[in-house]
A protein has these predicted regions:
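C-terminal regions of mature proteins
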Residues: 28, 33-42, 244, 397-440
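Histidine-acidic residue clusters that define the catalytic metal-binding segment
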Residues: 37-55, 197-241, 274-278, 308-310, ...
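Mature N-terminal segment immediately following signal peptide/propeptide cleavage
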Residues: 47-79
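M16/insulysin-pitrilysin zinc metalloprotease superfamily fold
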Residues: 106-110, 142-175, 356-413, 432
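His/Glu-based metal-binding/catalytic segments typifying zinc-dependent metallopeptidases
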Residues: 181, 270-332, 336, 414-438
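An aromatic/glycine/proline-enriched structural segment found at the starts
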Residues: 205-206, 242-298, 306-308, 391, ...
Length: 440
């Protein structure tokens, strides 16, 4: 029989005290600061070794755009990230945001033929995709550099004049159903489903996110297409979007491509509700969840509910704790567990994060003996954390981490165009655009 996957949720008190200590070291932090700003840039801080040029512009409709000029790029790319996702599903329309993502690319007023955009991208050496998360929906593509403007001409109308052709509703509804069924026996999805069942019912994360034939069915006087249009018209507002465009052209040329095409997106000054409730009620904590996997897996994850960490991007307390807890050298938590014969691997960090909170998790790959001794192992983890808390956060260690981060920013490797723009478009919602290259 496969071993159990354990997920333990604890009060955040111990870890919060550690975070408070890390935050107190703000004055000791090493910040890349103006000295790392490329001389060729006016409003975006980049590594001095980054030869690309950047420009941030805000269009008349409040759409923030990051332009990237890279004459050496093999592919041009663009990404538009909407700060809206499954959290914005209507209560009785689970999966609607995901369904909208599917329906969006089925023709526009300017290019009415479904699949025309996809065909154009494929015929010119490119790729395209999209993804719906809890709070983001990200659309992106890359293409042979000389075809960027023509690709943008097809991409932009999806966000101001899509057709949402009714004759494709059944086809895309079945495509969503197929995605849902494909992951039913995936252990990661099964763990996620069990976690959602424990989330406070008032929190949007407690709801089913993918969608299927049942949740997307046409109801009496409520066809799903009509509700899809309502969701689009309410939330696909320029003030909730970030656009990143990378091309071989100059910044002025890129701006000339973008402004007329994306200024047409409507701005409703939409505000998104921020859910202040905790993911899991304090009354339920500490909470132990056991999941029997379909594959041979032995893992334990200990999670702590914390405030949103993104506002502390300059100080990076969660990253400091992740490095401290996830260290693998002599005297580390992992080494201690290995000496007991209980663990094979360990990682730590703030993973799930939304507009109001985050989860900091310690994930441990167990040996067969570690699985048997999982209760004792958990006690040992908490004892180790308490020892670190009692000893306090050492300024020299924090400064060392900050120096390493500054060095990594200075000598960062160049990413592929499509992944780069997709990541930046999402990060622009979290950090000041001037700092987005170094904040994440």
């Amino acid at each position: 029989m496969p071993a159990l996957l354990n997920r333990a949720f604890s009060s955040a008190l111990t870890l919060s005290l550690l975070l408070a200590a890390a935050l107190s070291l703000q004055s000791c932090s090493t910040d890349p600061g103006p000295e790392t700003e490329s001389a060729s840039l006016s409003n975006v801080i980049a590594s001095p070794n980054d030869k690309r040029q950047y420009r941030h512009v805000q269009l008349s409709n409040k759409l923030d755009v990051l332009l990237i000029s890279d004459p050496q790029a093999d592919k041009s790319a663009a990404s538009l990230d909407v700060y809206v996702g499954s959290y914005q599903n209507p209560k009785d329309r689970e999966g609607l945001a995901h369904f909208l993502e599917h329906m969006l690319f089925l023709g526009t007023e300017q290019y009415p033929e479904p699949g025309e955009y996809q065909t154009f991208i494929a015929e010119h050496g490119g790729n395209h995709n999209a993804g719906t998360g809890l709070e983001h929906t990200n659309y992106f593509f890359d293409i042979d550099a000389q075809y960027l403007e023509q690709a943008l001409d097809r991409f932009a109308p999806f966000f101001h004049s899509p057709n949402f052709d009714a004759k494709y509703v059944d086809r895309e509804r079945n495509a969503v159903e197929s995605e849902y069924r494909l992951k039913i026996k995936d252990d990661g999805r099964r763990q996620w489903d069990v976690l959602q069942e424990q989330v406070d019912a008032s929190h949007p994360m407690s709801k089913f996110t993918v969608g299927n034939l049942e949740t997307l069915a046409d109801l009496k006087d409520r066809p799903v297409r009509a509700e899809l249009l309502e969701l689009y018209q309410q939330y696909y507002s320029a003030n909730l979007m970030k656009l990143v465009v990378l091309g071989t052209e100059s910044l002025d040329q890129l701006e000339a491509m973008v402004v007329p095409r994306f200024s047409a997106i409507a701005n409703y000054d939409t505000e998104v509700e921020i859910h202040g409730s905790q993911l899991i009620s304090e009354k339920k904590l500490p909470l132990l969840i056991e999941v029997e996997p379909l594959k041979e897996l032995r893992e334990i994850s200990i999670s702590f509910q914390l405030p949103k960490m993104k506002p502390y991007w300059r100080i990076k307390p969660a990253q400091y704790l992740a490095a401290l807890i996830g260290h693998e050298g002599q005297g580390s938590l992992l080494q201690l567990l290995k000496d007991q014969g209980w663990a094979e691997s360990l990682s730590a960090g703030a993973g799930l994060e939304d507009r109001s909170s985050s989860l900091f998790s310690i994930d441990i790959g167990l040996t067969p003996e570690g699985y048997k001794q999982r209760k004792q192992l958990t006690r040992l983890v908490f004892a180790w954390i308490e020892t670190v808390r009692s000893n306090g956060i050492e300024a020299w260690r924090y400064d060392e981490r900050a120096s390493l981060a500054a060095m990594a920013f200075r000598f960062q490797e160049k990413q592929n165009s499509m992944g780069y723009v997709s990541s930046l478009a999402s990060l622009m919602h979290q950090y000041p655009t001037a700092d987005v290259l170094r904040a994440g």
